[in-house]
Amino acid sequence: MTDTTLLDLLSDSKEFATRHNGSGAAQQKKMLETIGVQSIEQLIDQTVPAAIRLPEKMKLAEPQSESMTLASLKAIAEKNIVNRSFIGQGYYNTLLPNVILRNVLENPGWYTAYTPYQPEISQGRLESLLNYQQMVMDLTAMEIANASLLDEATAAAESMTLCKRAGKSKSLAFFVADGIHPQTVDVVRTRAEFFGYEIISGSMEDLDNHDLFGALLQYPSTTGNIQDLTAIIEKAHAKKTLVSVASDLLALTLLKAPGEMGADIVIGSAQRFGIPMGFGGPHAGFMATKEKFKRTMPGRIIGVSKDSKGKPALRMAMQTREQHIRREKATSNICTAQALLANMSAFYALYHGPEGLRKIARRVHHLTAILVAGLRSEGFELANQHFFDTITLNSNEHSKAIYHRALAEGMNLRKFPTPDNMPVQLGISLDETTTITDVEDLLRVITGKALSSAGFAAQVAEDEFAGIPATCRRRSKYLTHPIFNEHHSETQMMRYMKKLENKDYSLTHGMIPLGCCTMKLNAAALMLPVSWPEFSQMHPFAPTEQSFGYQELAEKLSKMLCEVTGYDGFSLQPNSGAQGEYAGLIAIHRYHQSNGEDQRNICLIPSSAHGTNPATASMLSMKVVVVGCDQQGNIDHADLKAKIDKHRDNLSCIMVTYPSTHGIYEEGIQEICEWVHEAGGQVYLDGANMNAQIGLTSPGFIGSDVSHLNLHKTFCIPHGGGGPGMGPIGVKKHLIPFLPGHIEVTESADNKHYAVSAAELGSASILPISYAYIAMMGEQGLTSATQIAILNANYIMERLRPHYPILYQGKEGRVAHECIIDIRPLEAASGISNEDIAKRLMDYGFHAPTMSFPVGGTFMIEPTESESTAELDRFCDAMIAIRHEIKQIEDGEWSATDNPLVNAPHTQVDLMESEWTHGYSRELACFPSKHSKDSKYWPTVNRVDNVFGDRNLICSCPSIESYMEE
């Protein structure tokens, strides 16, 4: 053996893949034997159609070790220059309390959980999200709030469509007042274009001169100005115009709330509550509105219900509004939002409490007032006479020199766009990290003099709130609920967060076999760079020469994704898969426009498609035409051909998922692409199931034109209990000119660019996760992950086949990376539904698979490559044991109304009941398996009453009395 060979043998460069993939050679051999094949290659040959197999391996760099990857990422990060940021414009430096950093952001108990569709095992983060809603409702003085949106700009666009749905005006005009953040205007204009809305801009005082269905105001404005909106809103209402106000939660601790001025909707970002800027995200957007608009409000809403024992329990309310149910009639296409960030912001509010938040706001305002006093003493004029934390200097001949002098001193000011050779206005925003030294440095840089702040501080102290109009000063109380007034020591905070975490099921407890969700490992090494200051503290609108690190990261990741997908270009802007779909369909629409074919607005969608597909198509005012599926779950080719022929002249695109949502690799997918292309249409291939493609096939090779990727599925960004997500889109060469742009970076004299997110790179600070994953896995590791995901799904199918009907299989009797088992025959025989089985799985220590999608009365099971054979067996053993329990009901051994399934889940309180009246034992109820005795996860409530929750909607924190009742 040569030294080189020995070194290769001892190398740790491929170690990450062996840790990410859950099964080794011996385990794989056992699974292959169960399936009945000799090798994993034979299984893949039987599963993936030969026509779509890649002819050669992906050209990716050799895998790197964890230490090498982190070192290379650190080198990239260090190319970012993190100046002191005074840019503002919706993004501010924050101080994330270490107790939240350590116990939430860096805690897999929080970041690996899934969206709380199973409320009995999600009470912790449901409570935290309810706190978030209460926080937003209190600060905005509105009646109901959601539990989050993707960012402030998206929230503004959603508020526009809410105004149209909820209002009585027949107008198609929407007013965007001067003073809105430019990136918000960009996203709103994009959304308006495809609904056929006219955007009218101007001074808010002119609002009532127009016939409008809605208006968007900013308070405080982007220049920092503050004015009472009451009279303006009253005039708008007199003309049946609904008003949305974009606001700042920290400012609202001192300023009169928009709800008190009559606002119909209040939107914004919770970023200021402890969330790093992260070059644009992720951050939780918020929306609050009036009770009467609750059923047309977008986003997930947490509500208070009760469980089967009558005790208070939380759940996601009014889910029938969501895209997976309402499809093209949904209020929005958004699925993943920003749950993890919303939780962090809520904890920030709890930790500081109302007095602590007000103290932070007072300090920020006080420092701003000192800065203003110093500038005025030297004759500088402000564009805004009133302010909270932001001021705008009127243009003068020294403005450019001041801007560059600040840059030289490591300070970023905001430069307002002005015509060439004209003086620029400068914006300055302070935040909770600003010190008196920073203020003195700003005064010196701007005035050219070393001014002492002491005299100005004394002057300001005489009238602390002189910068805020008397009519705009907050007098109402907020955050009065006990939950915001109890957890101010680190010990209390740590224990409260742990209490909530302990209520929830996450990947720290066991596999989460949700089909179409890809709940794989989020390795610790991947998460580390997220909180590095070089990534986390960058302002998204910092000068380009300061963000070379992010630019390099984006370029390298885009090239990796192009290689993996077979596409030619990528945009990393979309903040979620749904937003990626939206951007992809816009690219298709713009492409048709460029060819003079505006009439192409028909979108073909298979009946099995995820609900986001028709919901997104509707956002572009496309006409959705549904294509049927055959009994095997495949797209009905005859029906597809007929509808292509019928709509040939107006066909825009087809949206397909591959492998299909039925969990199989459909034969003939390339022919489908060809038929659509022959008719002049484009192919949108939904990337939700990309985990079954990498290294074996690719969207580009199959023949599609555009796809979004769920980086929070396939590429290891954690789900976070419902966000953050990332949904970048890849396109073929002809669609590259139609990818999203951004007003801050895109040169577009004809204003034809469009934006779907507030920042150019969306949630940029989590991009290192996917970069590191690909770098550490390499071609072989990624391909192996795909193969093992397919192996695991087929192993589960074979183990469950004798006990449950398998609904769909491919040509050779195989499934892709997920399989669907049919519960309907069992329900017909026993009365036991898939919901009963889902709740019983909790007693066995599992999260349920996906319920009733894509077919009602079924389970879709996706194990992912990260699970060991032992974990797969534990799940299969649980499902088989449950089948035996169902048999006892069928045989009459247990009553149909009193058995372990209909009473599931069982709690610790159930175990300790003084009288046990059921026809089965306590042990069977609570400890049905050996594993449940060794390591028991306990649901904290009994089955939640969904109907009661929607009929008696409560979306605020319960009273202290209800907590005592628990």
Swiss-Prot record:
One Pfam family it belongs to: GcvP2_C
Catalytic reactions on record: N(6)-[(R)-lipoyl]-L-lysyl-[glycine-cleavage complex H protein] + glycine + H(+) = N(6)-[(R)-S(8)-aminomethyldihydrolipoyl]-L-lysyl-[glycine-cleavage complex H protein] + CO2
S-adenosyl-L-methionine listed as a keyword: no
UniProt keyword Oxidoreductase present: yes
Family per record: Belongs to the GcvP family.
Subunit structure: The glycine cleavage system is composed of four proteins: P, T, L and H.
PANTHER family the UniProt entry points to: GLYCINE DEHYDROGENASE (DECARBOXYLATING), MITOCHONDRIAL, GLYCINE DEHYDROGENASE, DECARBOXYLATING
HAMAP family according to UniProt: GcvP
Protein name: Glycine dehydrogenase (decarboxylating)
Source organism of the structure: Psychromonas ingrahamii (strain DSM 17664 / CCUG 51855 / 37)
This protein's encoding gene: gcvP
